[in-house]
């Protein structure tokens, strides 16, 4: 909103014309979000400590995690607040795509908050009922996607990565498909958030990549040149993505091993919802399988473990999600984390390659 006020005075003071450029506002929003998160961080963490919002640790988890008991959780609230203010200042809030992403992000964050609250208040790791959580996530994502399709003309066609001008129009079924993408991404990120800094960096990498996709899909000339779908107004989402990356960096300052704070479900679900909604709006739903490969593998490891145990009584992994399997296999926590970061970078580069390799 601030940028609109500044830009409105451009006739009297021509240098203010720079605020009409998405790139300029992206850089300003980035540093605004980082500074807010970095400055607020110590105060936010202290507040969580005073309220005794400590993390409950699973009894069946790795023994090395016992020392993490009591570490403040619900730090995802710091990320959300640090992104909201820059968005209100530097993003066009009249853009329906922006509202769609923010509603999903904050809606999923609210579900995560309720889940975290139940965990810290009851001092166990159970939290909100899985059925209630999933119902809320599908309701929010389904309504947002349906509204964007009906009122904004969001395409119901699903593009195929690495293939030029190939898409499948799902029609009315697209809303269900898109909701599955958003909910699946959110819960995959949630499962990944089990080690210090493990989830936030892949989230930042994915957000930066999707932010770039948002910029090019929102730019008619670039989208036409690359022969990718053009989504009117998607460029503004690159600013939102920049705030997520920046706030993530600010959060990592405190979340890096050994963590001073955990993001909790309020963080993992909201950030996962953000990534899923960005993938849907930029029409990169299937590409998320590549870009979010780390999240996909983590989720599949849990699904495989559950199915195997129910059908055969045996476990495929020593413990799921798979990062715990590696921990119990003797790898140190920091080595697992950094290797997952490296994999995320490689997958992001591969995803960006689809812009030309079609």
Curated annotation (Swiss-Prot):
Topology with regard to the membrane?
Multi-pass membrane protein
Pathway, per Swiss-Prot/TrEMBL?
Answer: Cell wall biogenesis; peptidoglycan biosynthesis
The EC code for this enzyme is 2.7.8.13
Cofactor(s) in the UniProt record: Mg(2+)
Q: What is its main location?
A: membrane
TM segments? Answer: 26-46, 71-91, 93-113, 138-158, 166-186, 197-217, 234-254, 261-281, 287-307, 335-355
How is this protein named in the record? Phospho-N-acetylmuramoyl-pentapeptide-transferase
Q: Which organism is it from?
A: Bdellovibrio bacteriovorus (strain ATCC 15356 / DSM 50701 / NCIMB 9529 / HD100)
User: Lineage, please?
Assistant: Bacteria, Pseudomonadati, Bdellovibrionota, Bdellovibrionia, Bdellovibrionales
């Amino acid at each position: 909103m601030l940028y609109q006020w500044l830009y409105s005075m451009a006739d009297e003071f021509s240098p203010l014309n720079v605020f009409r450029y998405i790139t300029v506002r992206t850089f300003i929003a980035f540093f605004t979000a980082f500074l807010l998160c970095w400055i607020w961080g110590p105060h936010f963490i202290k507040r969580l400590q005073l309220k005794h919002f400590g993390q409950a640790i699973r009894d069946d988890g790795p023994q090395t995690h016992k020392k993490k008991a009591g570490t403040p959780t619900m730090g995802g609230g710091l990320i959300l607040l640090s992104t909201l203010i820059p968005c209100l200042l530097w993003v066009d809030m009249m853009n329906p795509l922006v509202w769609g992403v923010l509603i999903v992000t904050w809606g999923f964050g609210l579900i995560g908050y309720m889940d975290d609250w139940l965990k810290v208040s009851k001092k166990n790791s159970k939290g909100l009922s899985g059925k209630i959580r999933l119902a809320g996530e599908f309701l929010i994502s389904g309504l947002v996607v349906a509204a964007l399709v009906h009122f904004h003309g969001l395409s119901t066609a699903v593009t195929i990565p690495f293939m030029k001008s190939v898409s499948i129009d799902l029609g009315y079924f697209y809303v269900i498909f898109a909701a599955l993408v958003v909910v699946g991404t959110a819960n995959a990120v949630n499962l990944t958030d089990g080690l210090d800094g493990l989830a936030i960096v892949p989230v930042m990498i994915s957000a930066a990549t999707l932010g770039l996709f948002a910029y090019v899909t929102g730019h008619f000339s670039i989208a036409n040149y690359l022969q990718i779908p053009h989504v009117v107004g998607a460029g503004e989402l690159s600013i939102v993505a920049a705030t997520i990356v920046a706030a993530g960096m600010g959060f990592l300052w405190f979340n890096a091993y050994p963590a001073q704070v955990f993001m909790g479900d309020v963080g993992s679900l909201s950030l996962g919802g953000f990534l899923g909604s960005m993938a849907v709006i930029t029409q990169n739903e299937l590409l998320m399988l590549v870009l979010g490969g780390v999240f996909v593998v983590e989720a599949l490891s849990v699904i495989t473990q559950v199915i195997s145990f129910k059908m055969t009584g045996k476990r495929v992994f020593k413990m799921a999600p798979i990062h715990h399997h590696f921990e119990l296999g003797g790898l140190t926590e920091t080595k697992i984390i950094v290797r997952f970061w490296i994999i995320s970078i490689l997958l992001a580069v591969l995803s960006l390659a689809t812009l030309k390799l079609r």
